[in-house]
């Protein structure tokens, strides 16, 4: 799956993830020559050095969260997983974004774990005396994302809020469904081409075009 691809891994990435990359034909190299840069912690020293590099400042390098590789594993495909959802920005950028979106896609696993703690599977021997209809209702209740729980089972996970279109957990448009564009592509740079970046407390996207 990763043949002829190179990657750099931060010390914060688990060894199992690195082993998976190698087992699928991927090579490991220095961050300056690697095609992919993976880290699990924006505050780790090796990752902060990349954030402070000229390559990163000039948009020649991008750091991704290694959970991208775990998302590729069950699909056995790199192209079916939008890697742009797994961009790992510096800590101060993450704090600004979390104030708007709630959390990043790689943090969804915390929500899954939290829901499992709230709605643990009921042992079969306990359900043996209940009717099939009641069991189905219990299962449906567990599958409901907005299950109402008692105060003694309060979830500490933060609530999803206005997840941006460019970093959605689900519902994104597949690349095969996108219309082809044959014109010239230009990078988005704040303060250039009549655009700027500002922060807003309303649910609208944070990018606005200047009034002409």
Swiss-Prot record:
Belongs to the TERB2 family. Pfam families: TERB2 (PF15101). The lineage of its organism: Eukaryota, Metazoa, Chordata, Craniata, Vertebrata. Component of the MAJIN-TERB1-TERB2 complex. This is Telomere repeats-binding bouquet formation protein 2. It comes from the Eukaryota. GO terms for cellular component: chromosome, telomeric region; nuclear inner membrane. GO terms for biological process: homologous chromosome pairing at meiosis; meiotic attachment of telomere to nuclear envelope; meiotic telomere clustering. InterPro entries: TERB2 (IPR028065). Meiosis-specific telomere-associated protein involved in meiotic telomere attachment to the nucleus inner membrane, a crucial step for homologous pairing and synapsis. Component of the MAJIN-TERB1-TERB2 complex, which promotes telomere cap exchange by mediating attachment of telomeric DNA to the inner nuclear membrane and replacement of the protective cap of telomeric chromosomes: in early meiosis, the MAJIN-TERB1-TERB2 complex associates with telomeric DNA and the shelterin/telosome complex.
């Amino acid at each position: 799956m990763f043949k002829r691809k190179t990657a750099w891994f931060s010390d914060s990435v688990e060894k199992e993830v690195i082993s998976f990359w190698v087992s699928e034909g991927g090579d490991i190299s220095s961050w300056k020559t690697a095609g992919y840069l993976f880290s699990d912690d924006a505050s780790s020293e090796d990752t902060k050095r990349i954030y402070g590099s000229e390559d990163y400042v000039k948009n020649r390098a991008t750091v991704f969260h290694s959970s991208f590789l775990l998302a590729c594993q069950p699909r056995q495909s790199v192209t079916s997983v939008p890697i742009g959802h797994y961009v790992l920005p510096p800590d101060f950028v993450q704090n600004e974004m979390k104030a708007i979106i709630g959390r990043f896609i790689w943090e969804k696993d915390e929500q899954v774990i939290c829901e499992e703690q709230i709605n643990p599977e009921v042992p079969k021997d306990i359900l043996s005396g209940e009717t099939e209809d009641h069991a189905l209702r219990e299962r449906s209740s567990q599958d409901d994302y907005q299950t109402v729980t008692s105060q003694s089972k309060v979830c500490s996970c933060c609530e999803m809020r206005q997840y941006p279109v460019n970093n959605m957990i689900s519902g994104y448009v597949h690349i095969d469904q996108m219309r082809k564009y044959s014109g010239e592509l230009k990078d988005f740079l704040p303060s250039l081409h009549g655009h700027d970046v500002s922060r807003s407390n309303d649910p609208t996207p944070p990018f606005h075009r200047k009034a002409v």
